[in-house]
Amino acid sequence: MPTGGSTAEQAEPFFVTGFQRSGTTLLRMMLDSHPEVAIPLDTTGLWARAERRLGEFEPLEEEANRRRLVESLLTEERIRLWQVPLSVDEVISASSRPGYPGVIEGFHLAYARSKGKSRWGDKDPGNMVRLPSVLGWFPDARIVHIVRDGRDACLSLLKQPFGGDDLLRCAEQWREQVGWVRQIGKILGDGRYHELRYEDLVEDPEAALRPLARFLDLEWSPQMLEYHRRVEESVPEEKRHIWPLLDRPPQASARYRWKREMSNGERICFEKRAGRVLAEFGYETLPGGASGAYLTEAMLAAGRVRAAVAGRLPGR
């Protein structure tokens, strides 16, 4: 693999993933600010959904069928949110990969070229549970996994309209998904899997990003630290409310909010379900695991309290 200056045709694609509200968008913005890299807004399961419809367009070896598939995908909302007017010809001609992976790569390469860049990546938290599909499409892909303390990730997620209201279920999902991705990473090995923590990224961005750049065979670029100056061109206005802090440098104060916002009961209940995995990722947990004094409080508080704080339970 060449280092720095590598073209999209020479370099493997990479996929950024992580549990929801764990800094995937922040990391996407930083990488997208590199002069060689283009990562559009989340595809949010688009490629998996389209794969289930491939029977309507087969065989893809026939260009007419590939064109029909691309035409269909160009009408998707997730592609519109990329804010780049792509044509069927641009997508078809961008990639020489055969079959459906070539269509996916064609979209990403066409997007990258529209930005004057050579390297493409995809960012989607949902890829945590779809990694077998991703690796089936792109056996040479590299995986970038950003991990955030599950207590903070869940607190943030439950404040979102799409986040649900069950803290305990969120704890279980965080435990299962980050553990699952790490296990896949062990199979892939260090050459194809890179893991970093959100807390380290916001505390010292350059120290966290330099190893990631090396992993992706990219030369270091200080432009990655200037991501907050590019929000208007990189995030559609209709979506900016989801990430209100993107237009400023990393906020170290965003770390460990659970210490201020979680009750003892919520913390114990969360750690009952995910404490072992929290500890495996180097996060602080109660000595000896959650037990005893606050258990009743925990069971009463879990799930409902976070929804009440977010103002979504009428009359509370």
What kind of feature is each model-predicted range?
Residues T25-E36:
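A conserved segment at the C-terminal end of the G1
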Residues A38-D122, N127:
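PAPS-dependent sulfation machinery
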Residues P35-I39, R142:
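Catalytic donor-sugar/metal-binding loop of nucleotide-sugar-dependent glycosyltransferases
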Residues G18-F19:
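P-loop (Walker A) phosphate-binding loop of NTP-binding proteins
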Residues M1-F15, P98, L158-P161, V178, ...:
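PAPS-dependent sulfotransferases, especially Golgi type II membrane carbohydrate sulfotransferases
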Residues T24-T25, G150:
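Conformational gate/switch positions in structured elements
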